Amino acid sequence: MAAELFKLTLEGESEILGLLTLTDFPGEFRMQIHLLCVSRDNQGKGKKYDGIAGSLIAFAARTATVKDFDQACISLLPKTELRAHYKSKYGMMDGGPQLFHEGARLQAIIKKYLP
């Protein structure tokens, strides 16, 4: 299973705001986020744009729901220092070493970041 790479840019611009890699696990109705990266200009208090990571997570959620509809799930294995951040800011749930979204939480993050 190869990961597929996606990039987030502003329409008509070439500057990459964020990157995401996804691997599909069809037997599990799950998309795994392997890489979730936000450009340096868009991190921390002085960031240029807000919501880059949320938009990438929402894109993964939408991709999963298009593929597996109501049984869809997305997951990621976060860096230790980001685990609490993903849970508090994006509402991700504990699934052992991984965090995940499924069901209504997938729809909520899509509505919030991809209106």
Task: Give residue ranges: language-model regions.
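Non-catalytic substrate-recognition and accessory regions of acyl/acetyltransferase enzymes
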Residues: 1-47, 59-74, 81-84, 88-115
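ATP phosphate-binding glycine-rich loop and adjacent ATP-lid/helix-beta elements
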Residues: 50-58
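Residue-level recognition of alpha-helix initiation/capping sites
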Residues: 55, 77-78
